[in-house]
Structures are given as C-alpha cells and as structure tokens.
Amino acid sequence: MDLTPTLDAIRVFCEERDWRQFHNPKDLTAALSIEVAELMECFLWKKADELTLTIEQNRSNIEAEIADIAIYLFHLVEVLQIDLPAAIDHKLEHNRKKYPIEKSRGNAKKYTDL
C-alpha cells in the first residue's frame, strides 16, 4: 500500500487553506480523539449480533470517520516528524516480547495476565 499520493493530497489540502499554523500536537491529538469518539458512536449500544447490519447500514459514515482519523493521525506524524513505518516496526517488536505466541495465541488477556 503506497500512501505517498494520499499523504501528498492531505498536505496540499492543508497548505492551500493555510491550516498548518493550527496543527500543533495538542490540537491534533484532541481532534484525533474526537474523531475516534465519533467512530465509536457508530457502534454505541449495539449488541454483537447487530454489528454486521450496523456496519452495512452505516458504511459510508464509518468510512468517513476512519478517513478523518487517518488524516489527523498523518498530520500528527508529520508535525512530530515520526518515521511511522519504523515506529510501527519498533512497537511490533516490543509487543512480540510482551505477547509471546505460545502464551497469547487465541487469548485476549492483557500481557500482565498471561
């Protein structure tokens, strides 16, 4: 998945509107949190057996909220100058140690409870 054209489009969108001045870590994390809450709202009070229909009926709204989350996350990554692939690789390696396959496979327990 090459996200370069998408990231460039996000960057241009903000530059054209001179919004970079508002994109500081505090406000970006707040915006990110709000967008995640809006995504959560799509599933609020739904029972497990209702989720398939909920997703089907609200797919466009769910996709829009996920897009908002991704856009703010990518802004934050850019502002903080984070090498996202490297950060993800580092975090996965850390999680491999916390959640060894032999203890965590098929298990939803937190690493402290394994």
Language-model features: where?
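Flexible "arm" and connector segments at domain edges
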Residues: 1-66, 70-114
